[in-house]
Amino acid sequence: DLLERTSENLHMMAKDAAGFLAEESLKPGSPFNLGIPREAIEYATVSLDRDDPSLYSRFDLIYSGNDGRPPRMLEYNADTPTGLVEAALIQWYWHEDVHLKAGVTGIDQWNGIHEELIAQWGRIDDHLGRLHGLRPHMYHFAYTDADDSGEDLMTTGYLMDTAIQAGLTSTLVEMKQLGLDRETARFTDGKNRH
């Protein structure tokens, strides 16, 4: 519970900081100018003001759990794939191997990443429905084949699977198959689907 509360508070603080930096960076001569194009800052500001949902984020915290000191943040990554498969799936398999197969009961995996991703897809779909008056008919999950390790494809495939489990129609597409429909100003996949 402490780690979840701390993470929620840190996430809210990060959003507040992003709003502050976005506002300040638009002021002439501001020392907080990050060199981000004005249009991108304005889009981010609208998104922050609307409280658009994000899919997931990851904190790197330092916390011993037994010295009375609160958790402290080392790093924050939002909507980036690093470590997602390991945290959501491999930790579950470790839990099964160490506890369940040994007959230990009453202990659950301490994170609920997989379940929360599925729930968050539902919230995102609802948000897009309210925002645009309709829900997307298909979610496209794009990956690059330039990643020799396969991590990008594995992570993208996993995220797509969680969206499917949330009841969303989804497809996997290579980045190089993405195009732009100039008439509708919408992105398309290799099959010319929006």
Predicted regions and their residues:
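Charged, low-complexity surface segments at secondary-structure and domain boundaries
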Residues: 1-5, 75, 99-104
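Low-complexity, highly charged intrinsically disordered N-terminal segments
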Residues: 1-43, 138
